[in-house]
Amino acid sequence: MILALSLEVSDLHILIEKRITFMDRVKRVIHCDRAYKMGLNGKNITVAVMDTGIAPHLDFDQRILHFEDFCQKKLAAYDDNGHGTHVAGIIGGSGLMSKDKRGVRLLSGVAPMVRFVVLKVLDRKGNGVTSHVLEGMDWLLQNREKYQVKILNISVGMMASAGKNEQEQLLHAVDEAWNQGIMVVTAAGNNGPKENSVTIPGISRKVLTVGSWDDNVTETGNSGRLTKNYSGFGPTECCIVKPEVLAPGTNVKSCSKDAKGYVVKSGTSMAAPVVSGAVALAYQKHPDYTPAEMKLKLYESVYPRGEQIGRKCWGMLHVNNLVV
């Protein structure tokens, strides 16, 4: 069986503390203040996370509705890698364990009251097989209504070694989820800056693909290097603009697999959940939106636009504009 999915090369622990992006700064960059003043926090919105799993971190406040393990078939929630937990924390960690002396939760996620359904399809090394991902997609479609899933975050990308049939199967699966009312948010991958470097399933015409706004730095971590302008770029082979939206993704501090800890990671894997959290806020305001309507709202709300910042995309996520 071909190893078709992998954590991306630059999803590394970045150790230079002076450049850490705390979640409160992320939320300032994407302009969340008006949304929070409106009382939006993601409550009663369910986000599915397809990744390495999720640890029972205290920041998740018993909001993990269901955990399904397609790798080892374990029943209790766990994350033997940490990537999925980090992603979930960006989307909706409460920040409980990050209070400063003033009581401010520095590391709360974008939508800190969302509920989670977590599908473990990647192993402890961040690798997976296409069959597990497809099983996860089938499970999600069968249980979408039971858990009222509105959003699916996929912060992984298919490797080039995957066969054409596997690629088509995955693209069909995410398109079907979209057709059934799930807003699919994917990472653009970290193979930029060359054109046509967006990973699958991010090349799908339907799904929303997210790149890193702050990828124009070069940092050295403990196990590798982030290349400058690492975010995957389009257009795709079918001349589709990808990624559509940019969000912060470099040196983001979020939940670790330790129940009380936090860790720093970088990559489009971190940018995608920023957008998933923002979409959760928007669904709280507009619960009847279809994925297509939400995607149009994102197109209309981004600022600055791509042409204003020299990027081939729609533009930068702007939450206040999104939730009006």
Regions found by a protein language model. Give the residues of each.
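C-terminal subdomain of the subtilisin-like protease fold in secreted/lumenal serine endopeptidases
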Residues: V149-N153, Q284-V324
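N-terminal domain-start motif of subtilase-like serine proteases
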Residues: I2-A48, C71-G82, L226-G234, L317-N320
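Anion (oxyanion) recognition and catalysis
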Residues: N41, D175-N179, L246
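Short glycine/serine- and small hydrophobic-enriched flexible loop segments
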Residues: G92-L96, D138-W139, D215, S276-Q284, ...
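Substrate-binding/access-modulating region of protease and related hydrolase catalytic domains
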Residues: V121-K206, E237-I240, S256-A272, G310-W314
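Solvent-exposed loop/turn segments at secondary-structure junctions
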Residues: G53-A55, F70, M97, L122-G126, ...
